[in-house]
Structures are given as structure tokens and as C-alpha cells.
Curated annotation (Swiss-Prot):
It comes from the Bacteria. The lineage of its organism: Bacteria, Bacillati, Cyanobacteriota, Cyanophyceae, Synechococcales. Signal peptide: none annotated. Belongs to the universal ribosomal protein uL29 family. HAMAP family: Ribosomal_uL29. One of its GO terms (biological process) is translation. This is Large ribosomal subunit protein uL29. PROSITE patterns: RIBOSOMAL_L29 (PS00579). GO terms for cellular component: cytosolic large ribosomal subunit. It comes from Synechococcus elongatus (strain ATCC 33912 / PCC 7942 / FACHB-805). Pfam families: Ribosomal_L29.
């Protein structure tokens, strides 16, 4: 899975952006839970999810 491009995020509508932010936060929570219970098989997903969340939050902040 490649890291997402910022241009893809900038093309989202405000509603889609808010939905993607909530989705990324939930996924990060699930990954933390899996790591705590030693069920995480792909630790690189932390980096990808955090990167995607940072991009989403950056674009949200730019629009304010």
C-alpha cells in the first residue's frame, strides 16, 4: 500500500474530508488495540494511517 498523495486529499469535499478524518482516527484506534493484544500483523499500517491522518488534518486546517 503506497502512501497517499496530498492532491488526492485536497480534491475531497468538506463532508468527505470530515468522514475520512473520522475513519482514519477509528482505524488508528483499532490498530493500537490490535497491537496491545498482540494481534497486529502489519505494523507498517501505523505509519500509513498516521501519515494519512496528518494529511487530512493539514488540508482541513488549510481550509479554515
Amino acid at each position: 500500500m503506497a502512501l497517499p498523495k496530498i492532491e488526492d486529499v485536497r480534491n475531497l469535499s468538506d463532508a468527505d474530508l470530515a468522514e475520512k478524518i473520522a475513519e482514519a482516527k477509528r482505524e488508528l484506534f483499532d490498530l493500537r488495540f490490535q497491537r496491545a493484544t498482540r494481534q497486529l500483523e502489519k505494523p507498517h499500517l501505523f505509519k500509513h494511517t498516521k501519515h494519512r491522518l496528518a494529511q487530512l488534518l493539514t488540508v482541513e486546517r488549510e481550509r479554515q
